Amino acid sequence: MARLNPLSFTPGPVIFFTCAVYIALFAALLTVHLRVPDYPSKTPDGVNLTQAWSDLEKITRRFHPYNSHANDDVRDYLLTRVKSIIASKKLGGDQVELIDDNESNATFSSGSTTVYFEGTNIIVAIRGSEDDEPYHSPQSSPPGERRLDNGGVLVNAHYDSVSSGYGATDDGVGVVTVLQLLSYFTESKNWPKRTVILLLNNGEEDFLNGAKAFMRHPISQIAHTFVNLEGAGAGGRATMFRSTDTEVTRYYKASSHPFASVVSGDGFKKRLIRSETDYKVFYEELGLRGLDIAFMEPRARYHTVEDSTRETSLNSVWHMLSAAIATTSGLASDTSEQFSGSEDEHEPYTGKVKTGHGTDAVWFDLFGKVFVVFQLHTMFALCVTLLVVAPLFLIGLTFGLSKADKNYLFARKAYMYSSDDDHPVHLYGWRGFFRFPIVFSIATAVVVGLAYLMVRLNPLILYSSPYAVWSMMLSAWFSVAWFFSRGASAMRPSALQRMYALIWLFAGSFALLAFVTVLSNNYQVAGGYFALFYFAGIFLALVLSYLELFFAPTKTAFARYSAQGDEPVSRPLTGTTTAARSEEPPIADDDATETTSLLRGDRRSFARHSGRRDSIDDENGNRDEEPVQLDLKQPYPGEQDWSGKLPGWLWLLQLLLVAPIVVILVGQIALLLTSALHQTPADGNSSLFVYLAFALLTTLLLAPIGPFIHRFTWHVPTFVFLVCVATVIYNLVAFPFSREHRLKVYFVQQVDLATGNNRVSLTGVDGYVQRIVADLPSAQGEQINCTTPEAANRKELMTCTWPGLPAQVVTRASRFSNKTDTDGWLDFSITTSNKTNEATISVAGQNTRACRIVVDSHHSGVTNVTVAGAVSDPRFKAVGETGSREIRLWHREWSHPWNVSVTWPRENSKPSGRIICLWSDANAGDIPAFDEVQHYLPVWAIPSKISDGLVEGFKYFQV
């Protein structure tokens, strides 16, 4: 009895190894993605995780947005901690300086909005051990004009939270990381070579205001590189969101647990990700080179009360802290000039530090252990090389096979001597060529159809059950692909089916790589890096298939061998010939005729070859030839007999070439996009885009199974099909939200201060927000008006408004005002000059430090804005090119007035509009409507702020 080959291309080994590869890699990827590495028992000198956690608990006790009294308390605590750390270290004096910045202000514009902001940043400068010159000389030169040098490193985190969240992850972990960096770098053994600037900025949540104020301080010109610490979730791993260039990114490589993909960087670069961080200011406006390290999931807890210490962990703190230490230490140890600009590019007052030019980068991690980074130009060169070399190499192999008479691809017939033979041997080389594209198209169409079905019937199920959606799509693609591939193989078996599938995969990945190459060269998009490895693996696997054919007999030898009667000349179109032949009764000895085979009991004979043999004998003079001896093993049932000569184990090498690298790289991208996108439809993003992304990635993940799937027996596909049915049913009928994955609804209360009328609004997903509002006590019996929001990025949502509980943001703060009615919350006056197009608007809000002046939409806006006390800066334009229709005012003092001078075009009418003041402090129960929403929301929903203020009190004005 022949021994079973455990590596042969038969169902058992194929099922075992294919399932083992995919299951093992999927499990490993999910473990790395979902589990945060444990913090070490021993930390580096200067790092105290217990103290870091204590700091995090203290600064996140209450909501602390810029416009809240709790924000002042957090600032006082941070100042105390910074002073305590500096005092406890040996490094001090001229080496470390604390800057309590209560002076910097900035006036700038974005679009049709002007912002005046007064900063309250905390800055600590640690002079580098190799920096001999003073690093801080405020009086020496204005910002934007200072000496060129090799620069230092800026590390930034913001200590303000949003008005609806405690800010543990956004950005409390970043803040305590900065405190630990201060403790670490002020250890004498850790003294950095380059100056390190530690910035705790205030006001990031409202318009990146704190970073803008930092630009006004002279010390902003010291650093040439930066590390920005952020948070957009609650716990988990901190990923490197984006980076400016290859040279900076290489220093992240020292992180003990890297977690990053350039795909997220491309998302920011191409504006697919709407939110912004201080990275934008440091890179685009200050000219620094650096990177963003941030938490990114779960987004359902972002900017809510669940962004708390309860939802994060010390492991998450260590993950960010360890990455920050490694990256900052590396950058601060770089004494080269790669981050320095040249003299000839220095232009006074450009506002940008001269940091040289970096190269676009490609980066990704492998299982959170290895970090790969190289230049985008290198990727482009490799792509072009593969696109040229791979086809030429395959053409060469094809030519070699043809010369060796072993090219069975597309071969219909073979002849013993020449095409003049009467009866050629049929090789069926075309059989199976069109199977893979048909199977691939049908399976892909099914998952795309499921995507549209989900969008139609239950689009938000991916909000709480993204992995159920993944299971549905993966199982659907696999089961459909198996059904058609196995069916085709059963009807028309072909030994070339695997090779033809690889040829089609080669063609498809060639087109994909060509597309990625164009994107990388013309648009600097690096997220297609996986296509390079995808194509390379398929190319090598296909090369093995070509080499495998060199083990086959020559077509001529096989034809002669078949003609001898030892093997059948050809097989019918079905794969049942062998079985059918075995069921026919053998010809008895007594029935032997002149055409009976010499092998008794075998119906195969020379009769069908007699005519051909006669012609051959006539042509060749009845020459005698030695019988052709071919050691053909039994082929897989139903497949071409010549394939019995092929090695049966090469398929495993092919599987290992195409599957693991695809699963690892595409799987990591799939998990990253899942975390980043699956809860964005609740913010107004398109759910169809997310489902189609899942469908595309499903196809990319499972396509490498295509060459092998026809060997699977029915057992595994049946189980997978049952999983598909179960997940389809679940995804169609399950409620999309849960206590763990709450739907965010966005709150704001608007008060007409002249009349006292107030309207509370909740914005959320259509169909769900109405249910939420209807159950609120204050909305019962009231007329609820639901309309589409005006904001372009929330057109997919619905805003429901009703008369809410009156706000008490001023009456309880009696120390700020003796007035108890809403009219006293905001005072303003307008003074006009002799000129017909100028006016000064004085605004004073009670118990607030944030107000706005909004010009009506029918007016073109103002062309000049000057705020009393503002310092001009040539780097900032107070008004954009199209004018300003909104002026946002922020003051570091409470209830402090603003005097704003505005100018408008002479040909326009005098502006009119609204003056609005904001109240954002929800800690003391001064906003009963918000407290009511928090209290009465169903367990599957949670409130968040929709704008800078929870309460907007307004009065109308006319110049």
UniProtKB/Swiss-Prot annotation:
Biased composition (Basic and acidic residues): 612-626
Record-level GO BP terms: proteolysis
Names of required cofactors: Zn(2+)
Binding site residues for Zn(2+) 2: 170, 205, 303
Comment on bound cofactor: Binds 2 Zn(2+) ions per subunit.
Pfam families: Peptidase_M28 (PF04389), PFF1_C (PF22250), PFF1_TM (PF22251)
Domain of life: Eukaryota
Top EC group: hydrolase
EC number: 3.4.-.-
Membrane-side (Cytoplasmic) residue stretches: 1-13, 400-432, 485-498, 546-645, 710-716
Residues noted as binding Zn(2+) 1 in the record, renumbered to the chain: 158, 170, 230
Keywords: Glycoprotein, Hydrolase, Membrane, Metal-binding, Metalloprotease, Protease, Transmembrane, Transmembrane helix, Vacuole, Zinc
Stretches for region Disordered: 128-149, 566-594, 606-635
Site annotation Transition state stabilizer: residues: 302
Annotated function: May be involved in vacuolar sorting and osmoregulation.
Assigned protein family: Belongs to the peptidase M28 family.
Protein's name in the database: Vacuolar membrane protease
Naturally occurring in which organism (per UniProt): Phaeosphaeria nodorum (strain SN15 / ATCC MYA-4574 / FGSC 10173) (Glume blotch fungus)
Lineage, opening ranks: Eukaryota, Fungi, Dikarya, Ascomycota, Pezizomycotina
